Amino acid sequence: KRVIASGKLTLEELKKGIIVNIFISITLSYSLIKYSFKNDYLFIVIFLFLSIFSILAAIKYTMGKSPYGYYGFGDIFVFIFFGLLSVFGSYFLQTNSIDYEVFILGSIIGFLCVGVLNLNNIRDIENDSKMNKKTIPTRIGFRYAKFYHYFLIIASILLIFTFATKFKISN
């Protein structure tokens, strides 16, 4: 059950929790960004923008007039934000470089994160259909949602093997 619908939290409690988490995220993000880039203000501004954009994307997932999570776009955003952006961003913060193999690693994480979202959406397919929430499983049905899930997992496994054979990790 959803936390508000189940009565575990009121709307005000949920909003306060979101605000506290946003404040903590901004504080920690700024500290890490400032530490990583010292006085390179271009990268500081870029990463602050990406941080704010990520927070807004998280809020727009389920809130607002047209939350994209209710229209089948959650998978794309999860792949981008939890996969590519989080891996690229973390890597760049630590190395100040961009390497194409990070795209493979970000895609692996992205496919697995979308897999978790897909499992939740499959579980909720009946209720989401009643609530007119247009997730991928509600659009394609239970049977094809399972095939979609197989694709997500197999794609991540194939990319793991691709990365492991192409880029041997040495001591």
What function would you assign to each model-found segment?
Residues F103-C113, K168-N171:
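Alpha-helical transmembrane segments
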Residues A5-Y100:
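Intramembrane alpha-helical segments
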Residues Y35-K38, G64, I122, E126-N127, ...:
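Juxtamembrane transmembrane-helix termini
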Residues K1, V114-P137:
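Acidic (Asp/Glu-rich) catalytic motifs at the cytosolic membrane interface
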